[in-house]
Amino acid sequence: MSRIDSDLQKALKKACSVEETAPKRKHVRACIVYTWDHQSSKAVFTTLKTLPLANDEVQLFKMLIVLHKIIQEGHPSALAEAIRDRDWIRSLGRVHSGGSSYSKLIREYVRYLVLKLDFHAHHRGFNNGTFEYEEYVSLVSVSDPDEGYETILDLMSLQDSLDEFSQIIFASIQSERRNTECKISALIPLIAESYGIYKFITSMLRAMHRQLNDAEGDAALQPLKERYELQHARLFEFYADCSSVKYLTTLVTIPKLPVDAPDVFLINDVDESKEIKFKKREPSVTPARTPARTPTPTPPVVAEPAISPRPVSQRTTSTPTGYLQTMPTGATTGMMIPTATGAANAIFPQATAQMQPDFWANQQAQFANEQNRLEQERVQQLQQQQAQQELFQQQLQKAQQDMMNMQLQQQNQHQNDLIALTNQYEKDQALLQQYDQRVQQLESEITTMDSTASKQLANKDEQLTALQDQLDVWERKYESLAKLYSQLRQEHLNLLPRFKKLQLKVNSAQESIQKKEQLEHKLKQKDLQMAELVKDRDRARLELERSINNAEADSAAATAAAETMTQDKMNPILDAILESGINTIQESVYNLDSPLSWSGPLTPPTFLLSLLESTSENATEFATSFNNLIVDGLAHGDQTEVIHCVSDFSTSMATLVTNSKAYAVTTLPQEQSDQILTLVKRCAREAQYFFEDLMSENLNQVGDEEKTDIVINANVDMQEKLQELSLAIEPLLNIQSVKSNKETNPHSELVATADKIVKSSEHLRVDVPKPLLSLALMIIDAVVALVKAAIQCQNEIATTTSIPLNQFYLKNSRWTEGLISAAKAVAGATNVLITTASKLITSEDNENTSPEQFIVASKEVAASTIQLVAASRVKTSIHSKAQDKLEHCSKDVTDACRSLGNHVMGMIEDDHSTSQQQQPLDFTSEHTLKTAEMEQQVEILKLEQSLSNARKRLGEIRRHAYYNQDDD
């Protein structure tokens, strides 16, 4: 590598450093001078390709700035070399595909450079990167005015692209207040290029107007004139924005345009002195001619001030880019005239041979007059623009002062509002403190009442008489105290586990007896305390409601004032819907973690897989509807579809969690059960994250494309978690030895189930005046109606599918197996209920049948009914009448089972109360009382231990029953 090439490489490295500063002018100038010295720019492009500048966004952006300046001010070979390397320049825009500010600027910069190179490749008359009017002299002999019209259109399109890119740069500068020097430096070549294009379009439109010079021609040029005026307004705003950047004004002098666009149709004597003639091209053979030797103009060396601000005296010798240079002198004009003459002779040799010698003198005079006219117009425009710029600066300062005053007023108003809200908050705190004191007083009164009641226990006979008198009064008040009783009952149920733990930790029987006596005293006194508690509660509730209403009124006023300042009303609604879905999933996860055992029917793995498919489809539909809402906008989008999808997705996920627990806990070993439940929790947690990612607080700060990406990524994560759960459940299908074929028709299975239930219940239609038997027959009738409704659902599915029903069942084999399993579960549970009722009829005095058997059988029927309804809901339509009827029949079965259970529990309580009345207790001595109490506690512990063992035994029986069912 030679020393010159080494210096070139060093200059490019320093110009494209990693610091976020503007490329230094001396390094860029070294590259430009290299192209003029060697009359070639191939080495510059080769060095740019070999240097690792594309790895860093800042270096790549600075490389594009350097490349743009080399194309503008370098040797014409730089433009030709850049046109050949358009594919390489286009590939630079795909290097960094991220969402950072520099990545977007790089893509837009590459897009603009490619458009510029395409323009130069199509219009070879522009032999340099700038758009000076003098450089287009070689195009004055274009054969067709249409080509000039097309050239103006292409230049205007390029000017629009330049304006769009400059707006993107300003937006990036405003978003990042620090380290904007590098981005500001990209505006320097854009200012020069935009002004060159503007000057050329102005001159070209005037020439076209002179050439056509009729009403029809002006009508044809009217669209170009309107677009020219629009571009003039945008260019004026662009230069005004550039003037507001102090750092940019130290680097380059901003052009000053008039407020109104110049009239390109205005013709004066100076304009008529120079016309661009458009002639029809005639095919002819070019005769041999003597090439005219024309002087080669010296390449322009455009000096630009350094990055650091310097005094004015030091910048007098340096000029900005081409648009700030003065117009060519008479000598320069004389140098360019032979070039135009040579170009004209090259294109029209026959016409040149016929021209008289004085034509060239007239042509030279016309060019000189045109140059003088353009110089005068430029000086006038600069003076007008200077005055307009000063007026604009004054208006800008006044607007800024008004804005500051308005901000101060708003700040004072906000401060006053904050003080008012603070005072209101202090008042509310004082009021709440008064309520706390009142509650403490009530608690002290309750303690006093407890002590008083303990003293009154001495006379039990008098107390029993008083309680008997008050019993009638409390019975009348029982209905009004039902809600309070349910709350106390819930508290009592919550205290039972703690009470059991405390019983195990009791060190002596005496302490347990004392605690029991205290509890009995409290229970006996609750009725006495209840009246005053209710009064105090009502009084406190009334005061609390009054304060809440006042607080709500204040908050409503504040909310109304805040809502008037915002237009986004849909975000809270969507957040509430998403939160409801999150709550549904959280409740299912809570039930999953609950230690209560599953008492419903056994769920087969095929049914779980069908639920997985339904959940996956609902998740995809939810993602699609949410993306559609983002694309259409909150105001014009379909919000109802999103709400339905959220409900369906959360409900299907909750159903999947519940049935997964049923299958894992009752069927699988502990290790596999924990594995399945862990995967189910991951799916539920992922669904919850899915909803949380779509909350407005997470989406307000991003654009629509990023929002759709978030939705798609969340859906992909959700599908991955569901796929993991599906892969974990599918091996369990191999464990089963399913006898029935997948082509089994669920429709025929449901019909067989209904016939079986009807035939089994025919021998029960006897006139037996037993309430249990009547309730059992009611459940059987409801189950028969349920199965018939399920058959109607299958018939409806057959009418909605375009393929035969058998093929539909074969295609959805997992759902088919789940539906068949649900039908068999209904038949089995109903058969157990019928068997229990038969034993009740055949046995004498119900020796072999207990009422508890009816409760168990009815619960099995209700659980299997729920499984059948859930399996049928998977493939039915949303507003299916048959499905609504099926769910109504399921509700009837559940109500009948609940009635049977309530009746049996009433019988048990009656028998228990009768047995207690038949065996009176002896409380004559304290020893007998304590002995009876200890015996009763021992009996309770035995029953609890028996209950625990029975539950464990029930789990083992269900697990073995599941595997035996699979073997069958």
UniProtKB/Swiss-Prot annotation:
Location in or out of the cell: Cell membrane; Cytoplasm, Cytoskeleton, Actin patch; Cytoplasm, Cell cortex; Bud tip
Domain ENTH, chain residue ranges per copy: 1-127
Cite the PROSITE patterns for this sequence: ENTH (PS50942), I_LWEQ (PS50945)
Gene Ontology biological process terms in this record: actin cortical patch assembly; actin filament organization; clathrin coat assembly; endocytosis; negative regulation of Arp2/3 complex-mediated actin nucleation
Cell inner membrane keyword on record:
no
Q: Which Pfam families match?
A: ANTH, I_LWEQ
**What would be one Gene Ontology cellular-component term for the protein?**
actin cortical patch
For this protein, what is any one GO molecular function term? clathrin adaptor activity
Keyword annotations of the record: Actin-binding, Cell membrane, Cytoplasm, Cytoskeleton, Membrane, Phosphoprotein, Transmembrane, Transmembrane helix
Give the note: Present with 40600 molecules/cell in log phase SD medium.
The task this protein performs is described as: Required for cellular morphogenesis and polarization of the cortical cytoskeleton. It might act in concert with proteins such as CDC42 and CDC43 to limit the region of cortical patch formation to the cortex of the bud. Required for the accumulation and/or maintenance of plasma membrane H(+)-ATPase on the cell surface.
Q: Which family does it belong to?
A: Belongs to the SLA2 family.
Record's protein name: Protein SLA2
Q: Which organism is it from?
A: Saccharomyces cerevisiae (strain ATCC 204508 / S288c) (Baker's yeast)
The organism's taxonomic lineage, starting at the top? Eukaryota, Fungi, Dikarya, Ascomycota, Saccharomycotina
Query: What would be the name of the gene that encodes this protein?
Result: SLA2
